[in-house]
């Protein structure tokens, strides 16, 4: 059980922890009693896709003990949009909304429908103001039509299936 004895709670509700003497990582815990392991594995798979696209913190490791499944992630030096700007949608700058639309669109183009769009699920990095999406618990895989995907990626032609 690496890290278990060194976990520092960052959030009571979400079971998010820092790790003593390891400032570059954080841990998300899933209690087995309330979470289906297949749902956890799907969340890991979807976040790995997001990380590959540069939209989410990379998952560094996973492990489990008798009560929890843990996801160990790179810690983003920043805070949630809720902590940075507050919860009021009117206080969120236009550039942030544009970036959120781009992120959700990019995920969708890559087969992920991300619906948990709240200021708590997006982190803004301190130095670069890059925005990351986290918490893929309500996300799901979607299959996009090959032509629609190509079209959204910039192809300039009509759908040959309907020509």
Task: Please place each PLM-identified region on the residue numbering.
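C-lobe/activation-segment region of protein kinase-like
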Residues: 125-163
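A short glycine-rich, hydrophobically flanked beta-strand micro-motif that places a catalytic Asp/Glu
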Residues: 60-62, 113-126
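Conserved short submotifs of the Hanks-type protein kinase catalytic core
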Residues: 68-80
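Short beta-strand micro-motifs within the conserved protein kinase catalytic domain, predominantly
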Residues: 58-69
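AlphaC helix of the eukaryotic protein kinase fold
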Residues: 41-44, 48
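ATP-binding glycine-rich loop module of kinase domains
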Residues: 4-41
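Conserved kinase catalytic-core helix
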Residues: 49-54, 82-120
């Amino acid at each position: 059980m690496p890290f278990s004895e060194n976990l520092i709670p960052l959030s009571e509700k979400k079971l998010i922890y820092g790790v003593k003497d390891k400032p570059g990582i954080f841990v998300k815990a899933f209690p087995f009693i309330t979470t289906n392991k297949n749902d956890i594995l799907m969340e890991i798979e979807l976040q790995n896709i997001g990380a590959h696209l540069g939209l989410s913190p990379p998952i560094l490791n996973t492990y489990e003990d008798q009560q929890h499944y843990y996801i160990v992630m790179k810690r983003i030096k920043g805070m949630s949009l809720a902590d940075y700007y507050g919860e009021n949608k009117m206080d969120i700058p236009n550039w942030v909304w544009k970036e959120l639309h781009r992120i959700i669109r990019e995920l969708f183009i890559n087969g992920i429908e991300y619906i948990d769009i709240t200021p708590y699920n997006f982190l803004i990095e301190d130095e670069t103001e890059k925005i990351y999406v986290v918490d893929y618990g309500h996300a799901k895989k979607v299959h996009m039509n090959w032509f629609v995907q190509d079209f959204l990626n910039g192809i300039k032609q009509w759908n040959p299936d309907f020509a």
